[in-house]
């Protein structure tokens, strides 16, 4: 893996500034804690632990004391870079994760939800193609797979059950992982103040 880029945003909407998600006592933070933390968790899982963090945590539109946008660039000790944008001013629900590899890339878009508000969930992948510079250069052949059903909740419950009953030692998402992503969020907020 070379680098990754993720966007996780929502539309906001009428009365959004009064929503519990923008109430510090109830939510603890703004869009970074609401949605950004999930993208950060994915980035840690895919890219690794980050040793450098640069961030802008901003209130660009909603008149509330919490952030409605977080812009984050992070780097691992071995040089992998990840960029995250978490937004409550996307004006449409959006989930997008681009993963760039030495020999190609993956693009994940959408989330299967009951409302389908994040669009169709898909994964697109392609290999880099330098051999035919007249046609394929900059336009590699892509393949896209669409997903109509979300079984992640069932898989998580099954894994939890296997851990509790001793069939599996440790879940993929541990308490240590949760603590590490919360510490990363603290670093992002702290870096944004500098």
Regions found by a protein language model. Name each.
Residues 77, 145, 155-194:
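C-terminal helix-rich "cap/oligomerization" subdomain common to oxidoreductases
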Residues 38-42, 95, 156-159:
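Hydrophobic alpha-helical segments typical of transmembrane helices
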Residues 1, 48-55, 81, 104, ...:
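Generic structural signal for secondary-structure transition and capping sites
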Residues 32-36, 150, 172-178:
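Conserved loop-to-helix N-cap of the C-terminal "lid" that shapes the substrate pocket in Rossmann-like
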Residues 1-63:
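Predominantly a Rossmann-like dinucleotide-binding segment in NAD(P)-dependent oxidoreductases
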């Amino acid at each position: 893996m070379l680098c990754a880029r993720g966007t996780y945003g929502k539309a906001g909407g009428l009365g959004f500034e009064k929503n519990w998600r923008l109430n510090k006592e109830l939510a603890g933070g703004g869009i970074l804690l609401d949605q950004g933390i999930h993208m950060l968790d994915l980035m840690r899982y895919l890219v690794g632990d980050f040793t450098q963090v640069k961030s802008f945590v901003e209130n660009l539109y909603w008149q509330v004391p919490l952030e409605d946008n977080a812009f984050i660039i992070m780097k691992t000790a071995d040089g992998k870079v990840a960029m995250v944008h978490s937004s409550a001013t996307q004006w449409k629900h959006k989930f997008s994760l681009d993963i760039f590899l030495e020999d190609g890339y993956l693009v994940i878009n959408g989330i299967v939800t009951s409302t389908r508000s994040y669009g169709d969930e898909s994964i697109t992948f392609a290999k880099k193609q330098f051999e035919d510079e007249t046609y394929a250069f900059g336009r590699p052949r892509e393949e896209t797979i669409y997903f109509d059903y979300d079984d992640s909740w069932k898989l998580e419950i099954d894994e939890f059950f296997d851990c509790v009953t001793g069939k599996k030692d440790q879940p993929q998402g541990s308490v240590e992982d949760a603590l590490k992503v919360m510490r990363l969020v603290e670093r992002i907020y702290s870096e944004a103040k500098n």
